[in-house]
Amino acid sequence: MDAADTAADADTAADADRAADADTAAEAAALTGEQQRIRRTLRDLLAERTGPEENHAATATPEGYDPELWARLSAGLGLAGLALPAKYGGGGHGPAALALACEETGRALAPSPLLATAVLAAPLIAALGTPAQRAELLPRLVDGSLTSALAVPGGSLALALGLTGDNTAEDWSGGGRAGGIQARAVAAGDGDGSGGGGWRLYGEAAQVLDGHSADLLLVAAHTGGFARSRTLLFLVREREGGTPGLVRTRRNALDLTRPHATVELRDAEAELLGEEPADVLGALAATGRIAAVMLAAEAVGAAGAALDRAIAGLGPRARPGHRTAGALQAARSTLADLYVRVEAARSLTYCAARESGPGPESGPLALAQALEALRATAGEGVRLHGGGSTGEREARLFYQRAASDELLFGPARRLRARAAERTGLFGEVAA
């Protein structure tokens, strides 16, 4: 490699830095002062407390995350309550502020209960809970003293949230047949819970995010048999010394920063979330649309970090003997294409987050774009760094996040197919 090639590499790196600075300035101009403060403070804290080694140590704990860091994120920065109403101790900022926070935690691949607690569980409690349940649970979720997880039968989380199919059309919760999770009333009355007593749950939920460590489980279960078939949400509380009938087993995960568990309910005592009648399936779908935006923000943050590492890793490869001029030019062109994909995903995510009420398609479409951008960027990072290097091991962590999220919430093609179905792109508009 000659001096001209080396100079060209230096110019390319400088151009990339200038482009990144320009994008950062443009993003900052579009954010409010409060949102800029949230991003800056959170990024500084995560830079101090996270990294490949720190994250690995955190995932090895019984909780699967760093409890001290979570306390600072929730009680200190108010992350868990950013989008919750102020009367419960939340920030009342709406989805946009929470999406910014998710982008930063995604950039750091920080293991935390943020997704399970603040994105999936808290909105359901706020939407369906009785006044007493909201007053009891939401302030504790906000300050981080209580963590929660959403448990649905089998591996049907994406379907239950309405992301990959119509959650009203398929019997994902059990459908009155064997399997799924079944709920039965234990009080006198008509036998379906209207007698005012408690409930018992029997069944199994797999791939429950943070299900091994959450203090409170929100369990989707089927009840009513064929006569009054319906899906309800129940609260299963962790008791000191263990909850009778509740068995939680942490499973090996493709992405260690996304720990999940199998939850077995063997005639476990439960409390109905809210009151009947309630539009549980509608609340799950609404939560799914918001969750898609937050997952997209995480994926965009991770994709941006993976791209930064790939660009940085290209520098050492430019030394004489490592690559030919043609190979370096091809790598630069690929990174430029990836940069466009990441920025397109970021734009879609920001647009979805800023809508006053995300439409049925904006969140899932942003998630599909972001997952594909993350997978492509992380994959290129693995290829550029080469096998066995430190950079390759770090790039692989981002690829594992992309693959894990697609398994849990995708894949991207099904997210897009469901969006097309809902808009009637290929026929009648779906429910």
Question: Where do the protein language model's features map onto the residues?
Answer:
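Glycine-rich beta->alpha junctions and the first turn(s) of the following alpha-helix
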Residues: 27-33, 38, 246-343
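A short, Trp-centered hydrophobic/proline-enriched beta-strand micro-motif
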Residues: 143-170, 174-175
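Internal helix-loop-helix
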Residues: 74-144, 213
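Asp/Glu-rich intrinsically disordered low-complexity tracts
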Residues: 5, 9-11, 15-17, 21-23, ...
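Flexible, small-/acidic-enriched active-site or ligand-binding loops
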Residues: 164, 168-169, 174-176, 207-210, ...
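C-terminal helix-coil-helix/basic helical segment that borders enzyme active sites and/or dimer interfaces
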Residues: 5, 17, 50-61, 315-323, ...
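A short core secondary-structure module
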Residues: 151, 180, 198, 202-246
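Glycine-rich phosphate/cofactor-binding loops in nucleotide/flavin-utilizing enzymes
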Residues: 2-4, 23-27, 39, 385-431
